[in-house]
Amino acid sequence: MVFPIEAIVGLVTFTFLFFFLWTKKSQKPSKPLPPKIPGGWPVIGHLFHFNDDGDDRPLARKLGDLADKYGPVFTFRLGLPLVLVVSSYEAVKDCFSTNDAIFSNRPAFLYGDYLGYNNAMLFLANYGPYWRKNRKLVIQEVLSASRLEKFKHVRFARIQASIKNLYTRIDGNSSTINLTDWLEELNFGLIVKMIAGKNYESGKGDEQVERFKKAFKDFMILSMEFVLWDAFPIPLFKWVDFQGHVKAMKRTFKDIDSVFQNWLEEHINKREKMEVNAEGNEQDFIDVVLSKMSNEYLGEGYSRDTVIKATVFSLVLDAADTVALHINWGMALLINNQKALTKAQEEIDTKVGKDRWVEESDIKDLVYLQAIVKEVLRLYPPGPLLVPHENVEDCVVSGYHIPKGTRLFANVMKLQRDPKLWSDPDTFDPERFIATDIDFRGQYYKYIPFGSGRRSCPGMTYALQVEHLTMAHLIQGFNYRTPNDEPLDMKEGAGITIRKVNPVELIIAPRLAPELY
């Protein structure tokens, strides 16, 4: 992130110095405040602490180092907002069990206004009637186990088609396959098919989907950019656009919304012409939401169309990006741990055989595969800091006073590598999950890859189905080696998420009979 230092510091210091001193003076907590990392500046706090520091690791790693120095509960300021970082079992349980309702809000970020349908997207919405009913719609109607069961043929067919595409790329014993790109194409195509009924193949799909894919990538970049209002949330700074990010957000949103609007109108017209309004006739997620939602939604100021588009966008974000990212790490770990890969292949060969492909109904019997997925999620959680929370009133975490309006980062990556909770925490060892009943649902506060409490990820069931089935196909269908027969580089990229810097490039060979591809 690059900040226009002179402009920001001058304007903000002049405007907020008195306010900052007044609020600091007026604080009279009954309990001690958490440790605060040193180096903060007046008014702007620690805005520059993580900026151009020469450390290109993920933010979760940097915050983990600070936890080693200052403890598992500490704070810093990003402008005016106070940020609380927790990474111990006790602190995480305090936040998501004892204080779950108090930490149920989301901080206000400008991208939520300009890119997130004015915060109508489920993961951006504040806790309240709109959020509760929208989450109920998503969990009970769109992503319920019964609904996902009805769409399992779509998942299987799409994964099968992608596996066959991967097979056609094999050219002798020396051609290199970019598995990272393949996974991104698979997951993007799968979620577009399930949401809108669109068949997408890179370079061959319709123009709308290609345009949306570009806008989607722009969204991922813009949502992580520093915007002045995020650090100094008063109306004046909503109109200050030194870096041009607001202009870029508006342009990107226009592209995204036009695609969603076209998809929505296509579905409305189809339903009117074909009279597919009866229960059970839904062909994709947009059909499902249309059949369940009234014209005006909850009296919250959002139209039906806005809520549908915001909900669809939330599903795309959850599925297309984080699922591909996680499978990519999982396959990289298996390639670098050939004994684990061989054991997983032997399990599938024994339980399923080599004359058909793994199906979703087989997953329950593939215990070692399930352990692999759990272990990958432990080492590389899809949201290493979760989506930030904000407390709606003062509370206590680990004996510390946390004032109202504090932004919460739960460092899940640090938590799930805590040597007090995990033996050999940085080692890839699926066996650790074989004899335990630890699951993904956030009730074991040392393992919360999808979050915990009322703001946990609603797309967990879908993500796990796709991850298990995709990894099972890749494990069953091919043998792998690296081009230079050296372990894959596991360098992690900078940013809020944990992305692998270098793609997973492999030489692959089929394990099954040709007629199965």
Swiss-Prot record:
Membrane-protein topology: Single-pass membrane protein
Coiled-coil portions: none
Cross-linked residues, Glycyl lysine isopeptide (Lys-Gly) (interchain with G-Cter in ubiquitin): 254
Recorded catalytic activity of this chain's protein: (S)-nicotine + reduced [NADPH--hemoprotein reductase] + O2 = (S)-nornicotine + formaldehyde + oxidized [NADPH--hemoprotein reductase] + H2O + H(+)
GO cellular component: membrane
Primary localization class, coarse: membrane
InterPro entries from the UniProt entry: Cyt_P450, Cyt_P450_CS, Cyt_P450_E_grp-I, Cyt_P450_sf, Plant_Cytochrome_P450_Monoox
Impact after mutating residue 471 to I: In CYP82E4v11
Protein name: Nicotine N-demethylase CYP82E4
Organism: Nicotiana tabacum
Gene coding for it: CYP82E4
